[in-house]
Structures are given as C-alpha cells and as structure tokens.
C-alpha cells in the first residue's frame, strides 16, 4: 500500500488506550477487509491496533479501532490511504470530473460534540483551518442512540491531522452520563394494542405505507436516551408489575445473549424489562428466561426475544447449530404475534409506536391485518409461565400466528 505512512509524524506516545468508532458503508467495509481478510490483517499487524467490524447484513457497519494513540492513528492513516487508493482506481465518469475526496464518518457521543464545536463554532473552525479537512458534526442523533456522526473529508494527510485533533478534544472532554451506542442494525417497528388482538408488533415491511415509513425514519433521527414505558398514555408500569418465564433451548440461547451480552443488554434497554437467564442445569436441554416488569415491557421483551429465536432458526435452516449464534435483531416482518393483553389494558384500542417506548412521538394508528388461522409449518410454539398474584404459576400454551 503506497504512502500508507505518509500522514504520520513522530509524536511522544500517550500512555492511554484510545477507542475510535467509524461508520462505513458495505463497499468501504469490503475494501478495508480485503480479499480473504488480507487487508485488515495487514492493517492490524502494521499498526498494532485492535480492529473489529460489526456483524450484520445492513448497509452500514461500525468499524472499531482500539489501541494506543500511535496505533490508532497509524490504523486510521492506512484506512484513509486505502480508501483514497480505491477512489483513484475507480473509473471516472468524465474526463473533467474530479474524483470525490476521502470521507470518514466518526461516531462520537453527543455530550462530547459541544467541546468539538466550541463556543460559537470556534473550535471546529480552527480544526478546519489548521488541517485543511472539511469537518461536519451532524445536528441529529444517530437512531436509537446518544451518539452523533462527525464527517471528515479531504485528502488523506488532511484527514489524519483532523482525526488527531478531534481525538485530542474528546480525550480532554470525557463523555457526560451514560452513552447508548449506535447499532446500525437497530430500526423501529410499531407496537399495536387492541382489545381483540392483544399485543402485536408491526414491522416497517408489513402493512405500513411508504409515507408512514418515511415519517418513522424521520422521527428515528431525533432519538433521545431510552425512556421507560411510562410514557405510553394510560399505562402505569409501576402498578402492574408481573413476571413471565420462557424455556429456551440451550443451542439457541446464544442468539438471545449476543456477543459479550450485547443482545440481551439491547433488549433490556429497548423494553425496560428486567431479564434474567438461569444457569444451565445438568442434563437439561433448555434454559429458563425470566422477564419481570410492566405488561408492556414484558410483551416487548418477549417479542424481541422471539424475533431473535426465529431469526436464528431461519438462518440455520431450521436445524440449530451446536455453537451459540450471535445475531442482530432487525425488525423485519414479524413472525409472531404476542400474548393477549392483560385485562386492565383492554378497552379503547391504542396505537403505541416503538419510538414511544424510547421517548419519541407517537405514530398515528395503523390498521392491523387479520391474523391467519395458525402458525406456518415448522414454527415452534413456546411455553410460557405467568406468575399469579398468589405466587402460583399457571402454565399456558402460547401459539403465535403471522399477520
């Protein structure tokens, strides 16, 4: 890779560990990974930085670079020159058309962006002038997170200098409060509550019109930190706490937990429910998953867990693998309908958007297509146990039907 070290200057290395997250499109990710992973392997070896790329089939992926400041800047330098190399190799549409600049999109906690912009924009203006790179801080939060995208574009040397200065600012100004990281695979669906149909989740590929999808995407760009389900009109989660228990096969529990607990943590944040996964008993083929919270929290958590299980089964062709799966939970067309709503919630139909659960504006009511008579062939039914008020457990068979 010619010129991959061109933007680096010798600096005393700080004794800290720096983590830099970048948002990349699929084509950029493919370029960084290279054939059989050769490019990313070379970047790791030459920079000594730890580089991970998020899994998933969505158009965007998160590339995380961790290491000493020198290692991270070296890796960013090699990535910038690799992307520049790709732009040079791309065929030009016309002889007089200049090729676009190299662009990196950094993902930074919103609480640190104020320091990056500076009073009346003085800091970001200084960075632009001293580095020659274009820097743009997004006005909106990334969907379902407390992070913003910071776009840096220009020639590789200018980008490297700019990233150095940005990192210096964020190291001097640690994030305030908890940070909800951006996950590109996370999108919004719509939860519907009706007296006759109970809880259901409407994915954005179901009966939602294109206009409603557009509005939902616009709302998602104004996401705020996760809120409790108490924002739903007419519901008081504090007075209707209950628990529900699932039995999940051992070979599918991995897709519910996720890598280093990322998936179960995401489900807890999205639903507001407390979720406990029991230890594996000797000789048992299933694990107990207990969900505790308000009826709305339980229903939403149950849907998200069921979506993980059905996605894992469909991905493996119906035959569970021996290794735990680490799968994203996209809100694709829902495969299941959730349990009947509690008696206290029945009555006038409500429309509760998933954005409402995390503090956004409610969506208009969406009509729910009638359910088909039964589940499709091969769709497993899960046994759930609801804890009664007197402490006894009543087992009931829950069969799920598609819309």
From Swiss-Prot:
Keywords: Cytoplasm, DNA-binding, Repeat, Ribonucleoprotein, RNA-binding. InterPro entries: KH_dom (IPR004087), KH_dom_type_1 (IPR004088), KH_dom_type_1_sf (IPR036612). Coiled coil: none annotated. One of its GO terms (molecular function) is mRNA 3'-UTR binding. Residues 17-67, 101-154, 241-293 form the KH domain. GO terms for cellular component: cytoplasm; cytosol; nucleus; ribonucleoprotein complex. Pfam families: KH_1 (PF00013). It comes from the Eukaryota. GO terms for biological process: negative regulation of mRNA splicing, via spliceosome; regulation of mRNA stability; regulation of transcription by RNA polymerase II. It is found in: Cytoplasm. Single-stranded nucleic acid binding protein that binds preferentially to oligo dC. PANTHER family: KH DOMAIN CONTAINING RNA BINDING PROTEIN. This is Poly(rC)-binding protein 4. It comes from Homo sapiens.
């Amino acid at each position: 890779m010619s010129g991959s070290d061109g933007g680096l200057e010798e600096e005393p290395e700080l004794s800290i560990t720096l983590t830099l997250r970048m948002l990349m499109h699929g084509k950029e990710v493919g370029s960084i990974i290279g054939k059989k992973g050769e490019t990313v392997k070379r970047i790791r070896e030459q920079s000594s930085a730890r580089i991970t790329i998020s899994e998933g089939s969505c158009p965007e992926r998160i590339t995380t670079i961790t290491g000493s400041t020198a290692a991270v800047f070296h890796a960013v330098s090699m990535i910038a020159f690799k992307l520049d190399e790709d732009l040079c190799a791309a065929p030009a549409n016309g002889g007089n058309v200049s090729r676009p600049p190299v662009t990196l999109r950094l993902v930074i906690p919103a609480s640190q962006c104020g320091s990056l912009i500076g009073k009346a924009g003085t800091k970001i203006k200084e960075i632009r002038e001293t580095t020659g790179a274009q820097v743009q801080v997004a006005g909106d939060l990334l969907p379902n997170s407390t992070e913003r995208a910071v776009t840096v574009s220009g020639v590789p040397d200018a980008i490297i200098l700019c990233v150095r200065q940005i990192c210096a600012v964020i190291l001097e100004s640690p994030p305030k409060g908890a940070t909800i990281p951006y996950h590109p695979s996370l999108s919004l669906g719509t939860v519907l509550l009706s007296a006759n149909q109970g809880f259901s989740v409407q994915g954005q590929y179901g009966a939602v019109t294109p206009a409603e999808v557009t509005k939902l995407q616009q709302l998602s760009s104004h996401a705020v930190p996760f809120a409790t389900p108490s924002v739903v009109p007419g519901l008081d989660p504090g007075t209707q706490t209950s628990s529900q228990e699932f039995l999940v096969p051992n070979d599918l529990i991995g897709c519910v937990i996720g890598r280093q607990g990322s998936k179960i943590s995401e489900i807890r944040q999205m639903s507001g429910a407390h979720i406990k996964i029991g230890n594996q008993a000797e000789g048992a083929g299933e694990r107990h998953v207990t969900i505790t919270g308000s009826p709305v929290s339980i229903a939403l958590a149950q849907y998200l867990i069921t979506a993980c299980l059905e996605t894992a089964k469909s991905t493996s062709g119906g035959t569970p693998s021996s290794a735990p799966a680490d799968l994203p939970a996209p809100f694709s067309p829902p495969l299941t309908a959730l349990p009947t709503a509690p008696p206290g919630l029945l009555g006038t139909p409500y429309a509760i958007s998933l954005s409402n659960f995390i503090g956004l504006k409610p969506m208009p009511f969406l009509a729910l297509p009638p359910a088909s008579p039964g589940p499709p062939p091969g769709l497993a039914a899960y046994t759930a146990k609801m804890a009664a008020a007197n402490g006894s457990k009543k087992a009931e068979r829950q069969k799920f039907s598609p819309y």
